[in-house]
Amino acid sequence: MKTILITQIKSQIGRLPKHKATMKGLGLRNIGDTVERKDTAAIRGMIKKVYYMISIK
C-alpha cells in the first residue's frame, strides 16, 4: 500500500478542538513533525480537515 508523508507547518494554538484532535490522531504535535501514514480513505479525510496546517508529500 502507498504511504503519505505528512509534515506540520503551522501551530495548533487557537484552532478548533476537533482539528487539534485530528492532528493528534495523525500523530503530529509540533511544527516540523513529520509522520508516514498509509494512504487510506480515513487518513485522506483527516488530511482534508486540517489541510491548512500541514504539508503533504
Swiss-Prot record:
Origin: domain of life: Bacteria
Signal peptide: none
CDD domains linked to this entry: Ribosomal_L30
The UniProt record lists the keyword Zinc: no
GO biological processes: translation
GO molecular function: structural constituent of ribosome
NCBIfam families assigned to the protein according to its UniProt record, in alphabetical order: rpmD_bact (TIGR01308)
Protein name, entry field: Large ribosomal subunit protein uL30
Native source species: Buchnera aphidicola subsp. Cinara cedri (strain Cc)
Organism placement in taxonomy: Bacteria, Pseudomonadati, Pseudomonadota, Gammaproteobacteria, Enterobacterales
